[in-house]
């Protein structure tokens, strides 16, 4: 009886895949895969702005540091629900425009809506009654949170179908799948560099002088200007890719089972019939993101608060110190992205020389653990310097160089995190006959659930130990070390 049920579950998982890679006449040319992968540059431009500017911005709107992580919780929640849903429905989409292209187009339009809400949150809040001098601008915070939620929904609506589209175009070719995902990671790096460069340029608002208003200061105006550039890039690369790359209309095979399986039945069916290699991949991915998310959430805040000794809630001098640290953190993230880009292009060759993906992934997780642990040393050196030179003293060149070096080195494991898990999931799903969209949606669940855990836990943990960022980073270092051991020992 259990074997019969397992077979039914397997049929449910595989039913939507009747045209995943088999209906393409072999792999598509690499230039088409690169065109689709380039959408990642537009996605990541906006994501880079989220990571580098929005945590400080929401604190300027009046949200305390320990609660800002709860606003970020909307990202993991939307990822948990949206990406598997989009994967499921895109696997089954019968639109004449193809399976993936309608979802990619819808995601790009949602990004445009979100950018307007986020960029103009302070202005909308002021027009609804927020006072410029009040510490907590509640209406602006609500509008910001709504825009932030929509932006995360849009990013998940875009990213899942893009990666699934690459899997479709690779048509089961393992090497092309790895290469396509490496290019996706490379274009993420390109988007990061552009986003962090824009975020670190303090006079960008002068290009769009209308962005500065009574309710929106220079920092806010720069944020608006950055998002205008972001949505322009995203729309350009998306339009080019959707026009250039054909996405064949899907229709079920004549001999396929036409019974419709509910979405949640399909998800649970996927977990029931999942083979050991996929389970091991999910475990390592989950540990990896427990390690990453505290740093991705608070990296620039760490530069402004711990390294530079500033405070977003302090007097003008402390705010100035904090903003200086934020902008240097933006430079660090740009260096991180440059390393990420070069590493992405070399993943295939390095993986072969090291003897496979599990050795490479395990090795770079050691780098991740060491770098996260070293943030403690950099912070202590900065605090010691301020005790000697005075609380308003800028960090020494050595301290600043040490912090920027950590940012740069973290680009190495980040390239692997953005590439190898998705390539392995695509390869495993192709070999098992599962739909690309659903398989990548299941993988995404092991990314966003750890993010939810971190979002709930890191703020209170940081507050318990004095309100800084180091406790979350130390938890990340421990998780990275564990993920390295697991990658070496259990990945196939």
From Swiss-Prot:
Pathway(s) the chain acts in: Glycan biosynthesis; sucrose metabolism
GO terms for MF: sucrose transmembrane transporter activity; symporter activity
Topology Cytoplasmic: residue spans: 1-33, 90-101, 161-181, 246-277, 346-359, 425-446, 491-492
Physiological role: May be responsible for the transport of glucosides into the cell, with the concomitant uptake of protons (symport system). Does not seem to transport sucrose.
Protein name from the UniProt record: Putative sucrose transport protein SUC6
Topology of this chain in the membrane: Multi-pass membrane protein
Ranges of the Extracellular topological domain: 55-68, 123-139, 203-224, 299-324, 381-403, 468-469
Biological process (GO), any one: sucrose metabolic process
Subcellular location: Cell membrane
Disordered, as annotated region: 1-26
Transmembrane intervals: 34-54, 69-89, 102-122, 140-160, 182-202, 225-245, 278-298, 325-345, 360-380, 404-424, 447-467, 470-490
Any GO CC annotation of this UniProt entry: plasma membrane
Keywords recorded for this protein, A-Z: Cell membrane, Membrane, Phosphoprotein, Sugar transport, Symport, Transmembrane, Transmembrane helix, Transport
UniProt feature, compositional bias: Polar residues: 14-23
Family (UniProt): Belongs to the glycoside-pentoside-hexuronide (GPH) cation symporter transporter (TC 2.A.2.4) family.
Gene designation per UniProt: SUC6
Annotated InterPro entries: MFS_trans_sf, Suc_symporter_pln
Residue numbers bearing the Phosphoserine modification: 17
Main location group: membrane
Pfam families per record: MFS_2
């Amino acid at each position: 009886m259990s074997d019969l049920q397992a077979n039914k579950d397997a049929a449910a998982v595989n039913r939507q895949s009747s045209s995943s890679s088999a209906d393409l006449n072999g792999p598509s040319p690499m230039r088409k895969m690169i065109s689709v992968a380039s959408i990642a540059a537009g996605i990541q431009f906006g994501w880079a702005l989220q990571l580098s500017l929005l945590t400080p911005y929401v604190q300027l709107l009046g949200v305390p540091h320990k609660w800002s992580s709860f606003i970020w919780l909307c990202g993991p929640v939307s990822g948990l629900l949206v990406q598997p849903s989009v994967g499921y429905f895109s696997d089954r989409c019968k639109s004449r425009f193809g399976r993936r292209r309608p979802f990619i187009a819808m995601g790009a339009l949602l990004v445009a809506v979100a950018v307007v809400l986020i960029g103009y949150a302070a202005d909308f809040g002021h027009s609804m009654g927020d006072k410029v001098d009040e510490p907590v601008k509640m209406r602006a915070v609500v509008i910001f949170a709504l825009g932030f939620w929509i932006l995360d929904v849009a990013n998940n609506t875009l990213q899942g179908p893009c990666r699934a589209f690459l899997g479709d175009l690779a048509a089961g070719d393992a090497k092309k799948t790895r290469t396509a995902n490496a290019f996706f990671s490379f274009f993420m790096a390109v988007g990061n560099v552009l986003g962090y460069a824009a975020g670190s340029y303090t006079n960008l608002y002068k290009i769009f002088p209308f962005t500065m208003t009574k309710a929106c200061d220079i920092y806010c105006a720069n944020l608006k200007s950055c998002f205008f550039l972001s949505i322009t890039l995203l729309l350009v690369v998306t339009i080019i890719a959707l026009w250039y790359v054909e996405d064949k209309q899907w229709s079920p095979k004549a001999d396929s089972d036409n019974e419709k399986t509910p979405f949640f039945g399909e998800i649970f069916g996927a977990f029931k019939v999942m083979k050991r290699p996929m389970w091991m991949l999910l475990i390592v991915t989950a540990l990896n993101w427990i390690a990453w998310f505290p740093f991705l959430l608070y990296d620039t805040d760490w530069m402004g608060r711990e390294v530079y000794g500033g405070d977003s809630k302090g007097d003008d001098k402390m705010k100035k110190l904090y903003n200086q640290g934020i902008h240097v953190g933006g430079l660090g993230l740009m260096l991180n992205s440059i390393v990420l880009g070069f590493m992405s292009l070399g993943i295939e060759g390095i993986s072969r020389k090291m003897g496979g993906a599990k050795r490479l992934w395990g090795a770079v997780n050691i780098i991740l653990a060491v770098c996260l642990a070293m943030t403690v040393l950099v912070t202590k050196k900065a605090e010691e310097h301020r005790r000697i030179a005075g609380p308003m003293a800028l960090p020494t060149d050595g301290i600043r160089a040490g912090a920027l070096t950590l940012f740069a080195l973290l680009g190495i494991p980040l390239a692997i995190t953005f590439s190898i898990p998705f390539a392995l999931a695509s390869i495993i799903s192709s070999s098992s006959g599962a739909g690309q969209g659903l398989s990548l949606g299941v993988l995404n669940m092991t990314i966003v659930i750890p993010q939810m855990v971190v979002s709930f836990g890191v703020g209170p943990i940081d507050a318990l130990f004095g309100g800084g960022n180091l406790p979350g980073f130390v938890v990340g270092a421990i998780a990275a070390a564990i993920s390295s051991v697991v990658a070496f020992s259990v990945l196939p």
